[in-house]
Amino acid sequence: MLFRSRGFGTYLAADDDELADCPVELGAFWSGEFKAGGVPHRLVLAGAAESCDTTRLLADTQKICEAEMRFWHGRPGSASRAGKRPPFKNYLFMLNVVDDGYGGLEHRNSTALIVSRRDLPRLGDGRQTDGYITLLGLVSHEYFHTWNVKRLRPAEFTHFDYGAENYTQLLWFFEGFTSYYDDLLLRRAGLIDDAAYLKLLNKTINQVLQTPGREVQSAAQASFDAWVKYYRQDENTANTTVSYYTKGSLIALCVDLTLRAEGNSSLDDVMRSLWARCKAGPMTEADFAAVLRELGGRAYSRELAAWVHGIRDLPVEELLDKHGVVVLKEPAQLAQRLGIRVTETSAVQIKQVLRGGAAELAGIAANDEWVGVEVAGNGWRLTKLDDLTLYAGDHRKITAVVARDRRLLRLDLTLPAAVTTWRLVVRDPALAQLWLGAAH
């Protein structure tokens, strides 16, 4: 791994897997270093503007790394840390800064990230913007993968076949559980407060609830279909699939809160026990079930069958209430009420129509351009979706005028009376802290 100032020299990979796992980038970078758990880390930025507060970014990245080191290996100097060294001798963050982009790929001792320039922290501006929190969540997610997927990994990935797609039913665990911890560990690292964390969790919950595909595809099926569905999305994806990232994250939440409510253990303990049981290597769902049984004091086969392999909604609201967090139901935004997803530039363009919604019942289709509405004999040009309520007033029955393949269609649309969305609020701060601020 590159830590020298200029990096010139000869590098040798032990095998093809190591070669494929080591990203290489040449150019002029900003570079900063820190230690976490006694291990040297390097942060490299390419494409950042001069306004970027690199000191803050470096310090916050260090806090994330230290929190995740503690999660997996305990605090430095503690008895629980004996013989539990991090599985790498150094680590590299490669941040490629672009005008508009987001994503990352984990490696055994590095990660390659794409971040938007506007999401970077700015000199003289100490605000914790939503964009910066998203960036920190990405850093947290990919760093957590160093343990959970690059070492602890699906048994199907014991040996890689670079000439074919590799399938597993466990992405709900490896991506979903990582997604659960990426934001939670920001909270435990002190980078966000309870309200900010619950806002992020709330977004995940609503994403799942607003995906009709959750009623037809399980998290295990979504994992297996990643190559053919998740990475080949179309206008009907939301109706036929569920994200193993978001659904898996909520499965992790339910497992964690169930274990804590029963007073035996937590998902934190399960993750560390799996690390030890599988010797930081390949694992199966049976390994996960065995550790749950060992730490939880009972078999969780019914829960796993329903949550992982079933399609019913998860008991999120009930479990949150047991941990001092309540769900408030609030009116949803207009697009959600109608069951559509749109883009608005010069017109209202329909991107997706969700199964069972008012728009589908009216006959609105993906790729339609919603050009106008007729209400009580009056016609109105529609350029922004939110203007619909202005024109409709108290009327629930209107006519939607859409352009489809250059033809104008008049479709009878009934506006739904009420559709709600969730908002999470702490009811019992002391009880919530046992989960949100947990050290175990």
Regions found by a protein language model. Give the residues of each.
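Edge strands and adjacent loops of beta-rich recognition modules
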Residues: 13-36
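An active-site-proximal "capping" alpha-helix that borders the catalytic cofactor pocket
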Residues: 68, 173-185
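Active-site metal-coordination segments of metallo-dependent hydrolases
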Residues: 167-175, 242-244
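Juxtacatalytic substrate-recognition/specificity segment
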Residues: 33-171
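Surface-exposed helix-capping loop/turn segments at secondary-structure junctions
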Residues: 70-88, 153-155, 188-194, 260-264, ...
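C-terminal recognition in membrane/secretory proteostasis and scaffolding
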Residues: 182-183, 192-440
